[in-house]
UniProtKB/Swiss-Prot annotation:
PANTHER family reported in the protein's UniProt record: ATP SYNTHASE DELTA CHAIN (PTHR11910)
Membrane topology per record: Peripheral membrane protein
UniProt keyword list: ATP synthesis, Cell inner membrane, Cell membrane, CF(1), Hydrogen ion transport, Ion transport, Membrane, Transport
Stored InterPro entries: ATP_synth_OSCP/delta_N_sf (IPR026015), ATPase_OSCP/d_CS (IPR020781), ATPase_OSCP/dsu (IPR000711)
Top-level lineage group: Bacteria
Subunit: F-type ATPases have 2 components, F(1) - the catalytic core - and F(0) - the membrane proton channel. F(1) has five subunits: alpha(3), beta(3), gamma(1), delta(1), epsilon(1). CF(0) has four main subunits: a(1), b(1), b'(1) and c(10-14). The alpha and beta chains form an alternating ring which encloses part of the gamma chain. F(1) is attached to F(0) by a central stalk formed by the gamma and epsilon chains, while a peripheral stalk is formed by the delta, b and b' chains.
Protein name per UniProt: ATP synthase subunit delta
């Protein structure tokens, strides 16, 4: 991990822990989870939002005003909207994607759940997703929430990341392994 990624992750983890502890104190983890989901969806859907949080062109006041409007529009819980306002005033909004990921991890841990990131070459059907969720839950002895994404470059197969484990059954990985083997022989 690069130094800047490590620093960003550290900043996001500190904010996430503080927000999570506050939500836990107020018995408001459900609202925090809903807010994290809304922020994640907004980040994925809006290029302007991603630009706002990462571009140095916007001033603190512009970022604070925009993030306040977004928090109001999304009807985020006060603890989350206040944290976003603080992050804007400190020019820390660039860690928002990592913050959302950290919040989700803390919430999942609190609920005894685990998140699995599944990358497939083609979209998984509902039946495939349900079966995969069931198998992963059985292997982890926890409730598993699956985040499914599509990456056509895999050619076929799946890449499953769950906790510190990664299983790569993609055609791309097998072709790369074959290529490396052929380099060693030749």
């Amino acid at each position: 991990m690069s130094d800047s990624a490590s620093i960003s992750s550290g900043i996001a983890d500190r904010y996430a822990t503080a927000i999570f502890e506050l939500a836990k104190e107020e018995n408001n983890i459900g609202a925090l989870e809903a807010g994290a989901d809304l922020l994640d969806a907004a980040l994925k859907e809006s290029a302007e939002f991603r630009d706002l949080i990462s571009s140095p062109v916007y001033s603190r006041d512009e970022q604070a005003g925009a993030i306040g409007a977004i928090a109001k529009k999304l009807e985020l819980a006060p603890m989350l909207s206040n944290a976003l306002a603080l992050m804007a005033s400190k020019r820390r909004l660039f860690v928002l994607p990592q913050l959302v990921a950290s919040l989700r991890a803390l919430i999942a841990e609190e609920k005894g759940e685990m998140t699995a990131d599944v990358i497939s070459a083609q979209p998984l059907s509902k039946a495939n997703l349900d079966e995969l969720t069931k198998v992963l839950s059985a292997s982890a002895d926890k409730t598993v929430k699956v985040n499914a994404t599509v990456d056509n470059s895999l050619i076929g197969g799946l890449v499953v990341k769950m906790g510190s484990k990664m299983i790569d059954t993609s055609i791309r990985a097998k072709l790369n392994a074959l290529q490396n083997t052929m380099k060693e022989v030749g």
